Regions:
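C-terminal hydrophobic helical "lid"/dimerization subdomain
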Residues: 1, 259-304
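Glycine-rich beta-strand-centered segment in the early N-terminal region that forms part
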Residues: 21-38, 50-91
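NAD(P)H dinucleotide-binding glycine-rich loop of Rossmann-like/cofactor-binding domains
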Residues: 78, 88-151
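Mid-domain Rossmann-like dinucleotide-binding core that forms the NAD(H)/NADP(H) cofactor-binding site
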Residues: 125-193
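Short acidic-hydrophobic, aromatic-tinged amphipathic segments that line or gate anion-handling sites
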Residues: 190-195, 278-281
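A short acidic, Gly/Pro-enriched loop at the edge of an enzyme's catalytic core
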Residues: 202-209
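Glycine-rich phosphate-binding loop and adjacent beta-alpha segment
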Residues: 215-271, 303-304
Length: 304
């Protein structure tokens, strides 16, 4: 079957491949026929040791997607043949990812999703959405508190803005001027140009928490957090704690219950996404665009 991935361990070049269909599902596993699969900057880590997801090349990349269950292993509960599911899976039980036609998935990591929702929009949700949710859980903010998000224009930052705003949190975000109107529509009370050398001065400080979604901003954001506040970094660069501030790095984990809630938020209009669909056969170009920042702020989604 067609796949976009790597041919050997440590390879960084991504190509169109022909790989075998996944094996029959084992206990607690399902095979999913892919409708759409998300592409993210994290995918470059899957075959270089940065994120060990159990990839066994030649294999497809990708750790998120949506599709129909076409085989069900023993011991699976709540998921049946023909169900439509959305998943972020890591490690990958079949040693191969979602950028293909079929993939083996851990059933406990899959959430049932309605037929009416656009597969391209759904496939853009798992990794970024789960990261945003899990970061906000760590920060533990309540209505009326203030949150600083660096890179609010990115896929994770934009979802975090929307989720925080729904909870009544006041959000200030850094982003490009071209993204400012969109982020205000999402609920940001203030958007600061990240290219302004004095952006941290403009932010004024006194935030209850900071969410770091772009490398190199954590040390400038920390002084803007009040004593006893929180900082959560998504870029593995949380600075040492000071002034009683809890400073932590967060790494996304699969969570079907959180995916179900995100899907509900999407269906009920509380979340908005604008991903760009790309044919699976154009996957190498899509991967390169993501790594070089040529996506115009859109999440790219591969469609077989």
């Amino acid at each position: 079957m067609k796949a976009i991935g790597v041919t050997g361990p440590g390879r960084t070049d991504v190509n169109l491949l022909d790989i075998p269909e996944p094996p029959p599902p084992g206990r607690g596993q399902v095979v999913v026929e892919i409708e759409a699969a998300g592409v993210g900057p994290w995918d470059r880590l899957l075959n270089t040791g940065g994120w060990d997801v159990g990839l066994r090349p030649p294999a497809a990349l990708g750790v998120e997607g949506v599709g129909r269950v076409c085989a069900v292993g023993p011991g699976v509960q709540g998921i049946s043949l023909g169900d439509r599911v959305l998943a972020h899976d890591a490690p990958l039980p079949g040693g191969s990812g979602f950028w293909t036609e079929q993939v083996l998935v851990t059933a406990a990591h899959a959430a049932l999703v309605p037929d009416a929702l656009d597969p391209v929009v759904l496939a853009a949700l798992p990794v970024n959405g789960l990261t945003a949710v899990q970061a906000l859980v760590v920060l533990g903010l309540t209505a009326g508190q203030r949150l600083l998000i660096t890179n609010g224009g990115g896929s994770t930052g934009a979802l975090a803005i929307q989720l925080a705003a729904v909870a009544g949190v006041e959000v200030t975000a850094t982003a490009s001027p071209s993204a400012a109107d969109r982020l205000r529509e999402y609920g940001a009370s203030e958007v600061i140009d990240y290219r302004d050398p004095a952006w941290s001065d403009r932010a004024q400080g006194g935030f209850d928490a900071a969410l770091i979604a772009v490398p190199g901003t954590a040390t400038r954001a920390l002084p803007l957090v009040r004593d006893g506040g929180q900082l959560c970094s998504l870029t593995s660069d949380a600075p040492a704690s000071e002034r009683g501030i809890a400073s932590t790095d967060l790494y996304v984990r699969p969570d079907a219950a959180q995916l179900t809630q995100l899907t509900t938020d999407l269906a009920q209009g509380r979340l908005r996404l604008a991903p760009e669909p790309v044919p699976l056969t154009d996957g190498p170009d899509a991967y390169d665009r993501v790594l070089t920042g040529r996506t115009a702020g859109h999440k790219l989604v591969l469609v077989p």
